[in-house]
Amino acid sequence: MFRTMMRAKLHRATVTEANLNYVGSITIDEDLMDAVNIVENEKVQIVNNNNGARLETYVIKGERGSGVVCLNGAAARLVQPGDKVIIICYGLVTEEEVHKQEPKIAVLDDNNQIIEMLGAEKAGTIL
């Protein structure tokens, strides 16, 4: 049996742009992608802290060091520049791997720079 587990997260990313006329996806600074091991075209879930919207899309590499987090296409209707979002990536693991796998979590500042890397989340933690 396989379980779907969180394996990567960009916590409190700031949306820098929403581009309705783009084909689709989310553009993310490649440095942020590397920090949590998200790859281009990988499926991600996006949770908007400002309005509660949740959506799924795929990732396009953004310019390194730019801090870009741009929702493209129809997803642009669910965010505004300045919104805080959580970008989550899941993976399938076997029963044997469930307790061994450790997610990579990057906590971001208002400019989408990493301020802290976490390997786990604890209940009741406020960031």
UniProtKB/Swiss-Prot annotation:
Location of this chain's protein in the cell: Cytoplasm
PTM comment: Is synthesized initially as an inactive proenzyme, which is activated by self-cleavage at a specific serine bond to produce a beta-subunit with a hydroxyl group at its C-terminus and an alpha-subunit with a pyruvoyl group at its N-terminus.
Alphabetical UniProt keywords: Autocatalytic cleavage, Cytoplasm, Decarboxylase, Lyase, Pantothenate biosynthesis, Pyruvate, Schiff base, Zymogen
Gene3D superfamilies, A to Z: 2.40.40.20
Record pathway: Cofactor biosynthesis; (R)-pantothenate biosynthesis; beta-alanine from L-aspartate: step 1/1
Gene Ontology terms describing biological process: alanine biosynthetic process; pantothenate biosynthetic process
UniProt keyword Cytoplasm, yes or no: yes
Annotated organism of origin: Bacillus cereus (strain G9842)
Keyword Cytoplasm carried by entry: yes
E.C. no: 4.1.1.11
Function summary: Catalyzes the pyruvoyl-dependent decarboxylation of aspartate to produce beta-alanine.
The name this protein goes by in its record: Aspartate 1-decarboxylase
InterPro entries noted in UniProt: Asp_de-COase-like_dom_sf, Asp_decarbox
Active site residues per record: S25, Y58
Pyruvic acid (Ser) modified-residue sites: S25
Pfam families for the chain: Asp_decarbox
The protein's required cofactors: pyruvate
Domain of life per record: Bacteria
Residues engaged in binding substrate: T57, G73, A74, A75
Cofactor note: Binds 1 pyruvoyl group covalently per subunit.
Subunit structure: Heterooctamer of four alpha and four beta subunits.
Family statement drawn from the similarity comment of this UniProt entry: Belongs to the PanD family.
GO molecular function: aspartate 1-decarboxylase activity
Annotated GO CC locations: cytosol
Gene name of the record: panD
Main location: cytoplasm
